[in-house]
């Protein structure tokens, strides 16, 4: 399986969906990880750290989207000004996307429909509750 980590393009978004540590873990489990060059810079993770972790650094976000079976992002897919097309248009049928999509928000309904029409399987982190210990809700 090939995991893709593109650079976030939302204005002001400096986070990255995978750290060098998580990349090393994925590579150690036999996965191939593609990281767009500069993807971690806003979070103070530099390309050589990703290379040391076993990632393949990729210049072009389109290559990340074309080659990956699963895309990890922080924010929803947007229009990529530099490429002149939307990130969704770079995705392919059967590709998985894990990110924060906010599908219930009316402004995002069209985006969700566009991903479905493209055949992208999206998993949103919005509704996931993560606990490290039992809580009264368990």
Where are these regions (language model features)?
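An N-terminal-biased, well-structured beta-alpha scaffold segment characteristic
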Residues: 2-114, 118-120
């Amino acid at each position: 399986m090939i995991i893709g980590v593109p650079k976030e393009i939302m204005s002001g978004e400096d986070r990255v969906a995978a750290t060098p540590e998580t990349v090393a873990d994925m590579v150690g489990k036999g996965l191939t990880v593609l990281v767009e060059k500069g993807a971690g810079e806003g979070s103070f993770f530099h390309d050589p750290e990703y290379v040391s972790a076993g990632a393949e650094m990729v210049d072009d976000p389109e290559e990340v989207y074309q080659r990956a079976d699963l895309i990890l992002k922080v924010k929803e897919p947007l229009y990529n000004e530099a490429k002149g097309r939307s990130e969704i248009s770079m995705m392919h049928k059967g590709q998985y996307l894990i990110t924060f999509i906010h599908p219930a928000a009316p402004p995002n309904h069209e985006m969700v429909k566009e991903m479905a029409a493209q055949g992208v399987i999206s998993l949103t982190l919005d509704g996931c509750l993560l606990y490290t210990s039992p809580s009264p809700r368990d």
